[in-house]
A protein has these predicted regions:
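Anionic-ligand anchoring segments at beta-strand to alpha-helix junctions in alpha/beta enzyme folds, i.e.
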Residues: 13, 17, 25-75, 171-234, ...
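Structural signal for hydrophobic packing residues in well-ordered secondary-structure cores
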Residues: 5-15, 19, 51, 55, ...
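Structured C-terminal subdomain patch of bacterial secreted/periplasmic proteins
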Residues: 263-291
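An N-terminal, well-structured beta->alpha segment
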Residues: 1-30, 157
Length: 332
């Protein structure tokens, strides 16, 4: 909880450095690709939507292993808290040499530094927890300020999010659906991931081991929720909307018996509340939300070659354009 509670401070620090980071994140007219894995991929999605919203130019996003390196980009922004994620390093090493590379990390002196031209270092937002909370939100606070979007209210809303009541009594709910629109879709996916990371448990019975999901979460585009997923929720479901409510959705959700929550705070601050809910859910079940099973701080894979950027263009010229990154809403 200490890292969650520190977010007003880390956001304020990010806002203070925004002007200095515009040359890395907010150059007008460039064609930009943002990449990452897991939480960082969701933040890449939000960054891409925000940059286009600010009118600074075409911005794509992709999961690092699926990065369309055969396409022409002026700049690639790679997000990796640890700076050691293998798939991110491999994608960076495969880019044509003319592409400017930016690393967004919480740690300096890592392999990603050798593969990039510019570094956005958020070391004050680094975390001891395996599960990310303040690093991704601090990055998006920085992005919004660097892009020239309104941010005067952000720290105030983050402060309000910490003591705010949770939207429901978690003991009465076991299904959580998070919806977003535009840049907040990345937040919805991240909120759902926090439930899955923090509140799953292994049960062992006699000679047999099985996995039991004590709570489940999903995330979707807000306007797409009625195209199938709305049939799933019931009276123990919470449907949480980040940003404005899609017209008529309340009536559709109401028919299912589910509870719908539309936050009054900035969507980024609502994510702080969602983080708190995930921690509370884990605590209710006697779990450790900081160390979910099978997860580590960084995914480092053996057998994947990371080439120095000077040789990467030889292979990039023969690359195949990857498909558009899929929505993670129905995955996992």
């Amino acid at each position: 909880m200490q890292e969650i509670e520190s977010q007003p401070r880390t956001w304020a620090q990010a806002l203070d450095m925004a002007i200095a980071q515009r040359s890395a994140l907010a150059v007008p007219g460039e064609r930009v690709l943002a990449i990452g894995c897991g939480t960082s991929a969701f933040m890449a999605r939000s960054y891409a939507a925000l940059r286009e919203q600010a009118g600074l130019g075409e911005t794509d996003w992709a999961y690092a292993p699926e990065a369309p390196i055969g396409r022409r980009y002026d700049r690639v922004v790679a997000i990796s808290r640890s700076g050691t994620t293998t798939e991110v390093l491999e994608s960076l090493s495969s880019l044509p040499p003319r592409t400017r590379r930016v690393a967004v990390t919480a740690v300096s002196g890592k392999p990603i530094d050798d593969l990039t031209d510019d570094r956005v270092l958020l070391d004050f937002a680094d975390e001891t927890s395996v599960v990310q909370t303040r690093f991704p939100t601090t990055f998006l606070a920085l992005v919004r300020a660097a892009l020239g979007l309104p941010v005067d209210h952000l720290v105030r809303d983050a402060e309000a999010a910490l003591p705010a009541p949770l939207p429901v009594d978690i003991r009465d709910y076991n299904h959580f659906a998070y919806l977003g629109t535009g840049w907040t879709t990345g937040l919805a996916h991240e909120a759902a991931l926090k439930i899955r990371e923090a509140a799953l448990k292994i049960r062992e019975a006699a000679l047999k081991i099985r996995e039991a999901a004590q709570a489940w979460s999903e995330s979707y585009l807000g306007l797409d929720y009625r195209h199938g997923p709305v049939a799933v929720p019931g009276r123990r479901s919470l449907v949480w909307i980040f940003g404005p409510e899609p017209a008529g959705l309340a009536a559709s959700v109401g028919k299912s018996g589910a509870t719908m929550h539309v936050g009054a705070l900035d969507p980024l601050a609502e994510l702080v509340v969602a983080q708190r809910l995930a921690v509370a859910l884990a605590a209710e079940r006697g779990l450790d939300p900081d160390h979910p099973r099978l997860l580590t701080r960084s995914v480092v894979l053996s057998g994947m070659a990371v080439l120095p950027p000077t040789f990467a263009h030889v292979f990039a010229n023969h690359s195949t354009v990857a498909p558009t990154a899929p929505s993670p809403g129905a995955s996992l």
